[in-house]
């Protein structure tokens, strides 16, 4: 599920539980490209795509849409009918975007609230050397 105009299928190919079970590090981003109040979610998802181009052989990239019904919201043109995804409640996220770098043991080694640029994420990947 994504509110992105042209979603990158690689960001939706992996499930967090499966990635962690297979001992692969994960770059996980919670955002809503089509409905982001800060207007940074679309660019954040674009950065995930650029990083996936470079690191998808060693890291799983996962985008989680904030809303469970973005298509309905788009069709109706009504933000107020948006229903937050259950995982957003479980992670207790009250803002967006959020990006987490999780190692192969399931430990969050870095987290970023709000927009994070590609250099900061790459620095985290290199510093945490989980590959």
Give the location of each predicted region.
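Extracytoplasmic/periplasmic copper-protein system
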Residues: 1-4, 131
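Short active-site neighborhood of thiol/selenol oxidoreductases, capturing the structured segment around
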Residues: 2, 8, 15-37
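Short gly/ser/thr-rich secondary-structure transition/capping motifs
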Residues: 7-12, 78-82
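Typically the conserved alpha-helix immediately C-terminal to a functionally engaged Cys/Sec
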Residues: 13-14, 38-55
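A generic structural signal for alpha->beta connector loops
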Residues: 24, 58-59
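Thioredoxin-like thiol-disulfide oxidoreductase module
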Residues: 56, 62-96, 101-108, 123-130
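A short acidic/small-residue loop/turn micro-motif
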Residues: 115-118
